[in-house]
Amino acid sequence: SVIYSWDHLHKLHKSSKSSARENLIRRMTNYQDITGERVVIVFDGKGQTSESINDEYGIQVFYSKSGTTAYQIIERLAGKYSKNRKITVASRDRAVLDTCSSFGADAISPKTLEELLEQAERDLRKRMV
C-alpha cells in the first residue's frame, strides 16, 4: 500500500511494477542506513507457490505466497516480534494498523513513513555539510 500512497512510486508502478518495488527498497535501505533502524518490507507475491524472503541491499524483503496476502504476513510478524522489539508498521489499511497496534506495534500511515524518510534524508545532508 506504500507504493500506491507515494505519488512518485504510484506513477512508476503504472509503467514498471518491479521498478517501483526496487525504488522503495532502495529508499528504505537508505532509511535503515541513516537511522540504524532495521527495515523489513512485505510485498504481495503475485501467485508464488511459497513465501520467499530475500535479503536485498541489507534489508529483509518478504513476498507472500499464493493465497496469502502481504497484510497477513505483516500481522504475523508484528504479532511475533512486537513483544520483544520496537516494531513500526506502515500501511494505509486501517484493519492491519489496528491489528498490529493491538500486538504492541506502532502503526503509521504511508504518508507518515514518507515524512520520516524525508526527515532522515535531510538530517543526513546536514551532517555531510
Regions found by a protein language model. Name each.
Residues S1-V129:
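Nuclease catalytic cores that cleave nucleic-acid phosphodiester bonds
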